[in-house]
Amino acid sequence: MKQVFLWLIFVLAFHKLLAEKIGDIASVVGVRDNQLIGYGLVIGLNGTGDKSGSKFTMQSISNMLESVNVKISADDIKSKNVAAVMITASLPPFARQGDKIDIHISSIGDAKSIQGGTLVMTPLNAVDGNIYALAQGSITSGNSNNLLSANIINGATIEREVSYDLFHKNAMVLSLKNPNFKNAIQVQNALNKVFNKRIAMALDPKTIQITRPERFSMVEFLAIVQEIPINYSAKNKIIVDEKSGTIVSGVDIIVHPIVVTSQDITLKITKEPLNDSKNVQDLDSMSLDTAHNTLSSNGKNITIAGVMKALQKIGVSAKGIVSILQALKKSGAISAEMEIL
């Protein structure tokens, strides 16, 4: 039976201090995107639109025609060239009237395809019910395999701005993307050191309040804050996607010596040198006894990277690798957080 192996991607560091900028690890509270949504029609489809049985589509066509002084009952409309769609978009912070934003369109009826059609002018609303943008544009086929959704670059024009007055503010709040007591204090101390006064205070592991010095405007102040370097403490984390067989982990996460059994596989992890040279293979700086499923680090620490290479070498299935990782976590052999997707 063909074995299915996991791809191992090492992207997270093990308790290392990473050189980052404050702007990379924290966001300014209140300065964020706002989500927009709208309901509209895509016209000009070559018989691939919603069928006449889609009553909401036919009613929408009737309403659209009535807005241009053409009165016709929805029951009398027999068209397959129109599709009802939902439009979504993100309104960036500080966007101004006349700016363009991208939109995403998705069919909600029984259309076969919306490719090649034209989205007629559609208002986009926020959660407060107000219209913030108008969407309209042609849908090109591109390289998408999904015929029922599409993106239109610069497909909407902003008509209403979200007011946010930075100029008169004296204080703001930073929110860490990955809450951590140590990182919150490091951000606080770095800010106070750069400005040579107590302008920052960590309120909790995620939140740091900052006060603008009088000699700076708020825009100048935030520009300086975001560029300040910080030693960022990364978390130990292993992410397992069982469906795709992908594992994301730090290369330096240590696995303590242990014997773990899962299903029909037993793996022994040790620091002691292996004596049986017949079945021992070199695996980077480690040794692997394929006959007894024993992995030795030859006196050094064994990392999760080494364990993964050994498991693949002895032919453990994807399901078996996930089970062994879970067993290692449960036994305390690894101290990293584990997230199963």
From Swiss-Prot:
Alphabetic keyword roster: Bacterial flagellum, Periplasm, Signal
GO cellular component: bacterial-type flagellum basal body, distal rod, P ring; outer membrane-bounded periplasmic space
Entry keyword annotation includes Cell inner membrane: no
Localization per record: Periplasm; Bacterial flagellum basal body
Highest taxon of source: Bacteria
InterPro entries listed in its UniProt record: Flag_FlgI (IPR001782)
Pfam families cross-referenced by the UniProt entry: FlgI
Signal peptide region: 1-19
Example of a GO biological process term: bacterial-type flagellum-dependent cell motility
Record-annotated membrane-spanning stretches: none
Transmembrane helix keyword on record: no
GO molecular function annotation: structural molecule activity
Subunit structure: The basal body constitutes a major portion of the flagellar organelle and consists of four rings (L,P,S, and M) mounted on a central rod.
NCBIfam families in alphabetical order: PRK05303.1 (NF003676)
Summary of the function given for this chain in its UniProt record: Assembles around the rod to form the L-ring and probably protects the motor/basal body from shearing forces during rotation.
Family as reported in the entry's similarity comment: Belongs to the FlgI family.
Name listed for the protein in its UniProt record: Flagellar P-ring protein
Organism name: Helicobacter acinonychis (strain Sheeba)
